[in-house]
Curated annotation (Swiss-Prot):
Family, similarity comment: Belongs to the universal ribosomal protein uL10 family.
Matching InterPro entries: Ribosomal_uL10 (IPR001790), Ribosomal_uL10-like_sf (IPR043141), Ribosomal_uL10_bac (IPR022973), Ribosomal_uL10_bac_type (IPR047865)
Record's function text: Forms part of the ribosomal stalk, playing a central role in the interaction of the ribosome with GTP-bound translation factors.
Domain of life of the source: Bacteria
Lineage start: Bacteria, Pseudomonadati, Pseudomonadota, Alphaproteobacteria, Rhodospirillales
Protein's organism: Rhodospirillum centenum (strain ATCC 51521 / SW)
Name of this protein: Large ribosomal subunit protein uL10
Record key words, sorted: Ribonucleoprotein, Ribosomal protein, RNA-binding, rRNA-binding
UniProt keyword annotation of RNA-binding present: yes
């Protein structure tokens, strides 16, 4: 890679990291190309990105972002996973680490907060932003559906009584 390619890589990575809500630093030494491709596919499906980068370039790309404190994690063969959703990348990475012992989570970070591997594991157990929105919407809608049910119940009872009288009159 020549200097202009490195500068372009750093600039692209820096702009991606500026928008990220979570970054996870991983070690994946010994993983096959098929395994890395499978991990990338799972990350992409969850709305995340996974990149194997040179440590020096990753450290440079972190400068000027909210994740500058993570530069100590970049030792040895590392890769980064990042996403806008603060939980999505953690869920995929932790699930993948459970099934593949060559893949290890070194640490990660939220904007302004450095996490170790246990912190990333704890973060993966939280509900995602979409799950929180869905449960909040469900909580908001539940009282309205109960009120509608209560209001419809007397009308339904009157209709059933009238139908019973109509059947009784037809039979007589």
């Amino acid at each position: 890679m020549d200097r202009t390619q490195k500068e372009a890589t750093v600039a692209a990575l820096n702009s991606s990291l500026q928008e990220a809500g979570l970054i996870i630093v991983t070690k994946q030494s010994g993983m096959t190309v098929a395994e890395v491709t499978d991990l990338r596919r799972k990350m992409r499906a969850a709305g995340c990105s996974f990149k194997v980068t040179k440590n020096r370039l990753a450290r440079i790309a972190l400068k000027g972002t909210q994740f500058e404190t993570l530069d100590g994690f970049f030792k040895g063969p590392t890769a980064i996973a990042y996403s806008k959703d603060p939980v999505a990348a953690a869920k995929v990475a932790v699930d993948y680490a459970k099934t593949n012992d060559k893949f290890q989570i070194v640490g990660g970070g939220l904007p302004g907060l450095k996490l170790d591997s246990q912190g990333v594991d704890a973060l993966s157990k939280l509900p995602s932003l979409n799950e929180l929105r869905a449960s909040l919407l469900g909580m908001i809608q539940t009282p309205a559906t109960r009120i509608a049910g209560v209001l419809q119940a007397p009308g339904g009872q009157v209709a059933r009584v009238l139908a019973a009288y109509a059947k009784k009159d037809e039979a007589a």
